[in-house]
Amino acid sequence: MSRGIIIIGSGFAARQLVKNIRKQDAHVPLTLIAADSMDEYNKPDLSHVISQSQRADDLTRQLAGEFAEQFNLRLFPHTWVTDIDADAHVVKSQDKQWQYDKLVLTTGATAFVPPIAGRELMLTLNSQQEYRACETPLRDAQRVLIVGGGLIGSELAMDFCRAGKTVTLMDNAASLLASLMPPEVSSRLQHHLTDMGVHLLLKSQLQKLEKTEAGIRATLVSQHSIEVDAVIAATGLRPETALARRAGVAVNRGVCVDSYLQTSHPDIYAIGDCAEINGQVLPFLQPIQLSAMYLAKNLLGGNAPLKLPAMLVKVKTPELPLHLAGETQRRDLSWQITAESDGMIAKGMSGEGQLRAFVVSEDRMKEAFALLKTLSV
C-alpha cells in the first residue's frame, strides 16, 4: 500500500503544491504536518493590516478542516516535527511518527532579528500567528520604528504612516531597497515616503533597545536616540533549514535543491521560502507557484525540470507602487530613467545594450509586460 506524500508546512507553497497534485491525482495519500493552525491566509496582506484596521482573524480565508475536506487530506495542525529519518522514510514528532514515499519541506523562513541588547522588544510581522501575538501593541502604538528599509520595511512604513502613526524607518544602507536597486531608481519611493511624513534614518545602525516609562528608547551606534512605542524588525528572512540539516540534507542559505526541486536525498524535496534552487533563494509568489506546478508532476512520476521565466516582483506601496524585473541589483548596469508626473520607467542596460533589468512605477506599470518580453535573461 502506498504511504503517499508528506508535506511539512501549511503556507502558500504547501497549498499550491496540494492543488497541483490534486489536479493530476485525486487519490494519492497526502498528509500535511505543521506547527500552526493550518488555516489559510494571504501573507502579503500583512503589509496593509494597520491602515485597513484588520485584526489577525480577519485575514483567515479558509479553515483547515474545509481545506482537508476539499482536497482529501490528512492534516496534523499544531504539531512540531522534531526529526526526519531519511533512510527509513519516517517523519517524527514528540508523540507520533509517519511513513512516507516522498517528503516535501515547505518550512518557510523566519524573520531575522538583529542580535542587539533589547532584541526581545522587537516585533516581527512574518505570519498571521506573529501578527496575532502583537496586534494590540501595534494598533495602540503611535510612534513606530521600523528597522530595515527593504521591501517589507518600505511597505510597512507606508502602511503605518497611512494609519496616522509617526513612523521612523532605519537602515544601514544609504538608500531604500538597496539590495534590489541603485539609489537613483529607488529615490522616487524614498522622496514619496518622506513627503508622507516618514522620518528616514539611513546609514544608521541600531545599537540597543531599552524599556522606559514612556515606551522604548532606541539608541543608535552614533549614540543618537529616539523614543518610540513599538519597534518592528524588517531586516530580512532566513530560510528555515534546521529540520533539513538534522535529516542530513544539504543546506546552504536555504535547503539546496536542483531543477527538479529534489534535495541531496532522492525522496526529499523542498519548495517555497525555505528552498535554495540551484543557488538562488526566491521568496516571491510567482517562482513558488511555478515550483509547485513542476514538483507536483515530478512527485507523481514525471521528470520535469523547473524553468523560470523573467518574472515581476511587486512592491506593495499603494501610494507609489513599483514593479521590477531582471537583475536590478547588478551594479554594472547603465540606468536610463524617465520620470514624469504619472510614473517612472528605469531601464538597466548592459554594456552590450541589452535590457537586463527594469523598474516601473504608478501608471507606467502598464508597460511592465511589454518590457518583460524584451528582457534578456
Swiss-Prot record:
Keywords of this entry: Cytoplasm, FAD, Flavoprotein, NAD, Oxidoreductase
Reactions accelerated catalytically: 2 reduced [nitric oxide reductase rubredoxin domain] + NAD(+) + H(+) = 2 oxidized [nitric oxide reductase rubredoxin domain] + NADH
Gene name of the record: norW
Main location: cytoplasm
A Gene Ontology molecular function term of the record: oxidoreductase activity, acting on iron-sulfur proteins as donors, NAD or NADP as acceptor
Family: Belongs to the FAD-dependent oxidoreductase family.
EC assignment: 1.18.1.-
Requisite cofactors: FAD
Localization of this protein: Cytoplasm
Role according to the record: One of at least two accessory proteins for anaerobic nitric oxide (NO) reductase. Reduces the rubredoxin moiety of NO reductase.
Name of the protein: Nitric oxide reductase FlRd-NAD(+) reductase
Biochemical pathway: Nitrogen metabolism; nitric oxide reduction
Enzyme class per UniProt: oxidoreductase
Gene Ontology, cellular component aspect: cytoplasm
Source organism superkingdom: Bacteria
Gene3D superfamilies registered for this protein in UniProt: 3.30.390.120, FAD/NAD(P)-binding domain
Organism encoding this protein: Salmonella typhi
